[in-house]
Regions:
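Short, conserved beta-strand element in jelly-roll/cupin
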Residues: 56-73
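A short, N-terminal "cap"/entry segment at the start of jelly-roll beta-barrel domains
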Residues: 1-48, 54-55, 83, 129
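Short, charged, solvent-exposed linker or helix-capping segments at domain edges/interfaces
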Residues: 47-48, 119-122
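Ligand-binding loop in jelly-roll beta-barrel domains
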Residues: 94-120
């Protein structure tokens, strides 16, 4: 069975998303993508839009744990309230969101692989523009 320390996961999804570099380390195990995010302040709104995600929102549900920092989540064009997950918290953010990292953050995520690949491919496209 596969196992790894978060900071030993392959950088940029083992080359699938080179622009992410060491800020997003991930590997696909079965139907899940295990990811470790280390980022400074980042608002993904424009990345989703420029990458061509439908409605400018992330289509991947995210399940995770925050080691430090925080993640703010908005749900555009819905009546869902914004959320803020902080250190020591586990989270689930359904598809249809925008992620905003208001401060340096380290988080471990377990995501459906296909859905995450669509999101990361879009972010890669946006970064290449």
């Amino acid at each position: 069975m596969p196992h790894a320390k978060p900071d030993e996961l392959p950088s940029g999804g083992a080359g699938r998303w080179p622009l992410a570099g060491d800020n997003f380390r991930s590997v696909q195990w079965g139907d899940m993508e295990v990811g470790y995010t280390t980022t400074g302040p980042l608002d993904c709104t424009e990345l989703y839009r420029l990458g061509g995600l439908p409605g400018g929102v992330c289509t991947c549900p995210h399940y995770g744990y925050i080691f430090e920092g925080s993640i703010r989540v908005t749900y555009p064009n819905t009546d869902w309230p914004d959320e803020l997950a902080g250190p020591g918290e586990v989270y689930f953010f359904p598809a249809g969101h925008v992620l905003i990292y208001p401060e340096p953050t380290r988080a471990l995520e377990l995501n459906p692989a296909f859905a995450l690949q669509q999101c990361m491919d879009a972010m890669q496209r946006a970064g290449q523009r």
